[in-house]
Amino acid sequence: MMTEETTTSTSTVTGTVAAQTPRAVALSARGVEVRFGERTVLAGVDLDVRHGEVVALVGPNGAGKSTLLSVLAGDLEPTSGVVDLDGLPVAGQKPVALARRRAVLVQKQTLAFGFRAREVVEMGRSVWHRTPKAERDDEVVDWAMEVADVTHLSDRVVPTLSGGEQARVAFARLLAQDVEVHLLDEPTAALDIKHQEGVLRQARASADRGAAVVVVLHDLSLAAAWSDRVAVLSQGHIRAVGTPQEVLTPELVSEVYEHPCHVFHHEGNLLVVPLRSSRSSQEES
């Protein structure tokens, strides 16, 4: 159940994002376990994500980040445990009902051959077909493409785009869906610095308007810069959850990633840097 009363407000950009009090629980996972055969991928995971916050899932390869995101989205049924979305169990909800409450950006894009970029973004509006919200389809698509910096690619066939351009088109499609929970799996992996910042700035803006945002990131400095809380996963367990300053300590990061790391502050930013030997010392050895 949601732990706080909710109130209705209206997004200044798309009109629907901020329909919940920012501190109300959007997603709640309890005792989530996922096993594939004999292999346990997630073990006893508990996590709450609130409206109005960005939560970053970080951890080494194979830690269970993408699996947890899929469980939170309702795309993967856990072996045991429960996930609630705005107080309702995710399990058993119809796909359209889920799609009107949460949007998912998957790690591997499978955009259909032959579609133009704008057509792909318009697919995000399909869940609102034959509803009053459909009247704003063009407006919302225009906004999403501008925010994702893909307006100039509108008429390009998607397979002709670079990997980063395709990733931004997919992000625009997520924005066009215009829902209150955003689940992003490594949205910055194919992007240059400018567009990494742009995507996460928009994720932050969505949260500031009341959305709940969960984002899988490998870059810990990006996670520290843009998230309210960080959940550190390791071997299927959540090792720590808290503010970036609380959990991204050199001790924990070095242990989880099995590599010594520095964590320091620079002009108000928390930076995580792997410890490297100098080239001269490598040559001497």
Give the label of every model feature segment:
Residues 122, 135-153, 178:
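Conserved ABC ATPase "signature" region
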Residues 157-161, 165:
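Conserved ABC ATPase signature
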Residues 182-186:
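Catalytic Walker B motif of ABC-type/P-loop ATPase nucleotide-binding domains
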